Amino acid sequence: MKKIYDRGHEIGNHSYSHADYTKISAEAITADLDKCDGIVESITGERPYLMRAPSGGYNNTVVKAAEDSGRMYIQWSVDGIDYGDAEAQDIYERSVRRTQNGDIILLHNGTKNTAAILPKILEALECKYEFVTVSELIYKDNYVIDNTGRQFQK
């Protein structure tokens, strides 16, 4: 994590326990996020403020718990569906074909074919888009989120 952070990548919070946040209380969500934040901060020196729930499972309680504890809930807009036995070419097609300006692509580390196909995905996208951190991408205030999870400035 430290090497990734030191290369300029942003580290967010994806939970400590990987629990289904839609089935636990706001207090339990906050405690779980705090535990993860403490670990990230001990490694990077910076406490994350962005968070995404495990499996993308969220509801009003999850979003409010994040906001009430000074965090911002984020979600992805393109899913590479790279888990399980996903074939590299399928991951590539889903990731590249569906991506538009402002998208956040969901890919996982430790999956069967993601690491092998990632350079090809990056090469295809870097000629069309500028890669930025999530903090650089999102609006921090005066915004609305539509039913697809896309953020728009008011």
Where are these regions (language model features)?
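Metal-dependent polysaccharide deacetylase catalytic core of the NodB/CE4 family, i.e.
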Residues: M1-L106, G110
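C-terminal domain-boundary segment and adjacent tail
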Residues: N113-K154
